């Protein structure tokens, strides 16, 4: 299992890890029963940072696209904000709009439906922030609670301990690279300023070349197990 360090300067970080394809499938199966399912699927299939996912709003998610346009516009997610101090994404180039794979569209539709069904139960306590991922009363998710729920999923998947939500981003890079996506395209999908960042931080997960994002993720996850 590849291990690499992704930590702010001057701080000691836990080595990040990447899921294998078999582990990814086990994770997705286990996540299906979790309220965090759409969070896991979106993070894994788009590479969105965990601090970006926690503040993602529904008005930045297009689950329909424009299939009749010329050329057709696929369903997409616009990543413009982050839970970082100041609310901005990590860098200006971190602002990006990424196509959504079919598995992410399905998970988000189901999540949106459940959220709409559960909202009346909160009654007057509901706070409408328009968040895709929120508490039972509409408030932003706490990072510690996300980590706790995610670890329940990895344990249910038989993956053991020590995993964190940010490992989903490493898995995204690994799956994209294994699918033949060039490092330049992976850097753009991941919201990196330059390929050097991708190559440094995710160096053990990168492989040589060819193709693009949502289509590759659909092909990888839809392919039969060996």
Where are these regions (language model features)?
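C-terminal secondary-structure termini that scaffold catalytic or DNA-interacting sites
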Residues: 4-7, 18, 63-69, 73-76, ...
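Structural detector for helix-capping/boundary residues
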Residues: 22, 56-59, 144, 171, ...
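Alpha-solenoid repeat scaffolds
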Residues: 34, 208-209
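Extracytoplasmic/cell-surface-exposed regions of Actinobacterial cell-envelope-associated
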Residues: 42-43, 47-48, 53, 58, ...
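A short, basic/aromatic helix-end/turn motif that makes direct DNA contacts
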Residues: 55-61, 187-193, 203
């Amino acid at each position: 299992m590849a291990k690499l360090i992704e930590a702010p300067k001057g701080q000691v970080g836990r080595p990040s890890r990447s899921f294998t394809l078999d582990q990814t499938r086990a994770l997705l199966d286990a996540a299906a029963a979790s309220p965090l399912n759409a969070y896991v699927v979106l993070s894994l299939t788009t590479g969105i940072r965990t601090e970006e996912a926690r503040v993602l709003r529904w008005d930045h998610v297009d689950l329909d696209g424009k299939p009749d346009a010329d050329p057709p516009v696929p369903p997409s997610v616009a990543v413009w904000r982050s839970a970082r101090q100041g609310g901005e994404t990590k860098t200006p180039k971190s602002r990006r709009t990424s196509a959504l794979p079919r598995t992410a569209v399905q998970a988000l539709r189901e999540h949106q439906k459940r959220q709409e069904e559960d909202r009346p139960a909160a009654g007057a306590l509901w706070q409408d922030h328009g968040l895709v991922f929120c508490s039972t009363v509409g408030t932003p998710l706490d990072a510690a609670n996300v980590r706790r729920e995610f670890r329940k999923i990895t344990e249910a998947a038989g993956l053991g301990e020590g995993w964190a939500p940010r490992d989903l981003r490493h898995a995204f890079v690994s799956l994209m690279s294994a699918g033949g996506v060039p490092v330049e395209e992976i850097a753009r999908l991941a919201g990196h300023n330059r390929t050097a960042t991708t190559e440094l931080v995710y160096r053990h997960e990168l492989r040589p070349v060819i193709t693009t994002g949502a289509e590759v993720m659909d092909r990888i996850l839809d392919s039969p197990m060996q």
